[in-house]
């Protein structure tokens, strides 16, 4: 579980987030959507701890592990592909290397044996003995055949590196998985495999993607980021769109009725406030008027592209 409490962040005079409160729970996949520049990637960096918030805090469940899809394709040039995937579980990778270093020591002391036994126990608890086969399975699922597994990352083209880094994020069954545009650079078969993986994933996923079909297939919730606030919807992308449009229409209809009522009350007050026999009614209407407040309906920060053709002149009636 990942919980955000009173989160706030400002860049110069721009308020990016304000009093964001949200809880991400196990077994759910959350699609984070919003206009370009709304702060989706920044929000993921706040969740991962890569950025510090200026207000509030982010808390991860005790003993839980968070994994992030890395974007630096050149960070592991001298490492084997299979090793890069296993590096996704930092504690497992550290224990694996430490125990291997101990076994290579000469002389091998009694203290070394005790420490090695402790590390072996921890390694087994993390399913370390199946780590390499699990990593290979992820790579093959994403379309990276076995002949690439022992190659160095520097020998691969970017299309394969993208898949390796995705496998790294998925490795080791993380408790919370943060994915920023995970379908970028993937072929159709890899996207389908990823969809199936995430649908069957039992922990928490938070994903940013411009692919609404992908979000429709995997998301149980949509987090709509707009004007520094996050509105949570239960359902996939299409459900969010229908629900948000319906909620907006209902708010607009409510405001329209309130405006009509305000006009009616104002006309009554203006007409009868000076009339002695109607003054009490006018006073009562004024109290009613003071209690009416219109809903604050902000226009969305989203801007949808369109093409407009403006004719230089009207077309003639006669064709020559």
Regions found by a protein language model. Name each.
Residues 1-255, 312-320:
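ABC ATP-binding cassette signature C-motif
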Residues 113-130, 246-320:
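Flexible nucleotide-interacting loop at or near the entrance of a catalytic core
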